[in-house]
A protein has these predicted regions:
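A glycine-/polar-enriched beta->alpha junction
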Residues: 34-44, 51-66, 103-130, 137-143, ...
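Small/polar, glycine/serine/threonine/aspartate-rich low-complexity segments that form flexible
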Residues: 23, 72-151, 288-298, 332-336, ...
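Bacterial Sec-pathway N-terminal export signals of envelope proteins
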Residues: 21-99, 153-168, 172, 234, ...
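Amphipathic alpha-helical coiled-coil segments
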Residues: 45-60, 187-212, 246, 264-269, ...
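Extended, hydrophobic alpha-helical segments in both membrane/secreted and soluble proteins
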Residues: 226, 243, 327, 342-346, ...
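Acidic, low-complexity, intrinsically disordered peripheral segments
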Residues: 20, 78, 266-284, 289-297, ...
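Bacterial Sec-dependent N-terminal signal peptides
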Residues: 1-25
Length: 524
């Protein structure tokens, strides 16, 4: 029975281990970046701003939609005649009237500014008075049919005149679509920058655990050597307490490093857009720190060339350029709206009438020669608010917005230039720090190995060995941090120059090179 339970527990454990092993998320830079494009909330929300801008464009296009309109009105009326009314001899004091009015038409505003209107109207009425309008006896409720077709064209002469003014709101909306796309690109780049920094922090935390564990191993080595030396009466027994204390301290540092590793993993998942459960499934970091030769770094980088690349590639700079164009158009529209409304309308109409009952009379009312009415005309409409405060206020606000945006654009360009200078300087310094950290690490390794040999020969103290071991560990950590600073400097320069991600037919893409190499000026 116990054997059976053991087998069940064993296979259950293997199954669970296999399940979690299969669900691990491969933690390489390109892979997690692609996951972020799909799952990161900031990226998703940024994409919705594009859809919102496209919806605004659709709203502006609605101004030029074809509008169909129709109306049907049915009315019955009972009018009590005056006593002196001669119609009382033919009807019993009450004049009963029935009326039907129907109209339908099409109205459209053209992109050249004109408004066209085509409408059809039909009217029918009858009453219980037995004589018609020509004093002929026709009997009660004899129908009268009237129909007409009207065509009008309205041309604005001042406000709203011309294609440039009429379509300006539509073109402004198109600029805001382009603005939202460029802003989305910069948002994606900034998110990938944060992911890159979080990844290098995760990789650093992972390597720190390795270093502390290696350090533990070195201390245990020293402990074993110390025990042997004590047995050989080459060292006092009191030295063992020092080594044990150092070992306990190193185990504490390893535990703290593992805690930092856990936090770094969760923070990387946060930057990607993963849930808590998904973040805990992130595997060990796959990509190592970039090397200096691999990065294509060179001394005396051309700041001017990188600034030029940034002005061509940065999404936020392109976005504010579109906003400036849109505000310029909005300003022109506000200026036009300060003008009076003066519209010239030309119209033609055709109508006819017929009397009688029956459905055939309804259609004959459009073609009957008798009662035909054909004409044309024009009208001039003038509208202008006396103070015109609304138009003047909007004009003043748009002028302020335009000038404010110019200052904002200049400030952004100024900050981009400063940021690129800082990024290049940071890269230069990180290379120097990395090279010096490597030299220091090699020296400390050599010194520690020498102290170990001396210890085995009984030529140095345990305290000296512990001191050199701590310096070696500190040097290894500083070397890792120097690498992290170098890696972050590369992606920061990429982000500042707008070369961290690229827009493809299927969305944003990137490759591993953007995390390992600085921008190549010749490619831009």
């Amino acid at each position: 029975m116990r054997f059976y339970k053991f087998i069940c527990v064993l296979f259950t454990g293997v199954g669970i281990t296999g399940f979690y092993g299969q669900s691990k998320i491969n933690c390489d830079l390109v892979g997690i970046s692609n996951i972020a494009f799909e799952k990161n909330p900031t990226i998703q929300r940024s994409a919705y701003t594009i859809k919102s801008a496209e919806a605004d464009f659709q709203i502006q296009r609605s101004v030029f939609d074809v509008n169909l309109f129709s109306e049907v009105a049915v009315k019955t009326n009972r009018y009590t005649l005056f006593g002196e009314d001669p119609r009382n001899q033919f009807i019993d004091k009450i004049l009963k009237t029935n009326t039907l009015d129907f109209s339908a038409g099409v109205r459209k505003k053209l992109r050249t500014g004109q408004i066209t209107d085509i409408s059809l109207k039909y009217g029918f009425n009858n009453n219980n008075f037995p004589y018609d309008g020509f004093n002929q006896y026709v009997g009660a409720f004899w129908g009268n049919h009237v129909s007409s077709v009207n065509l009008s064209l309205t041309q604005p002469l001042l406000r709203g005149r011309g294609r440039d003014v009429t379509t300006i709101s539509e073109r402004i909306s198109q600029l805001y679509i382009e603005n939202s796309k460029s802003s989305n690109e910069f948002t994606n780049s900034n998110t990938i920058l944060q992911i890159g920094q979080a990844y290098w922090n995760y990789y650093l935390a992972y390597k720190r655990v390795e270093i502390y564990k290696q350090n533990e191993g070195r201390v245990r080595n020293v402990l074993d050597v110390t025990k042997e030396l004590i047995k050989a009466d080459k060292k006092p027994a009191g030295d063992l307490a020092q080594v044990n204390a150092d070992l306990a301290n190193q185990e504490k540092l390893t535990a703290l490093a593992e805690q930092s590793l856990f936090e770094a993993r969760v923070n990387l998942g946060r930057a990607i857009g993963l849930s808590n459960e998904e973040s805990l499934q992130l595997g060990i970091p796959v990509n190592d720190f970039p090397t200096i030769p691999e990065s294509e770094y060179r001394i005396d980088l051309d700041r001017t060339a990188f600034i030029k690349i940034a002005k061509e590639k940065r999404g936020d700079l392109q976005a504010v350029g579109k906003i400036s164009d849109a505000l310029e158009m909005q300003y022109r529209l506000a200026e036009n709206n300060t003008k009076p409304q003066l519209d010239l309308t030309g119209f033609v109409f055709y109508g006819s009438a017929i009397a009688g009952n029956g459905i055939d009379k309804t259609f004959s009312s459009f073609t009957n020669n008798e009662g035909r009415n054909l004409g044309a005309g024009a009208k001039l409409t003038f509208t202008f608010p006396v103070n015109n405060n609304l138009a003047k206020g909007n004009y003043a606000k748009d002028l302020v917005s335009l000038n404010d945006q110019k200052i904002s654009n200049e400030n952004l360009q100024r900050n981009i230039e400063l940021n690129i200078s800082n990024a290049i300087n940071k890269l230069d310094n990180s290379v120097i720090v990395l090279e010096r950290a490597k030299e220091a690490l090699d020296s400390y390794k050599e010194a520690f190995n020498s102290e170990q040999v001396k210890l085995q020969a009984g030529l140095t103290t345990i305290l000296n060995v512990i001191l050199f071991q701590e310096r070696l560990t500190s040097s290894e950590l500083e070397y890792l941090q120097a690498y992290q600073q170098f890696a972050n400097a590369i992606i920061s320069l990429r982000h500042e120059t707008g070369t961290l991600i690229s827009q493809g037919d299927r969305g944003f893409t990137l490759n591993q090179d953007v995390f390992y190499t600085i921008p190549n000026i010749a490619n831009y």
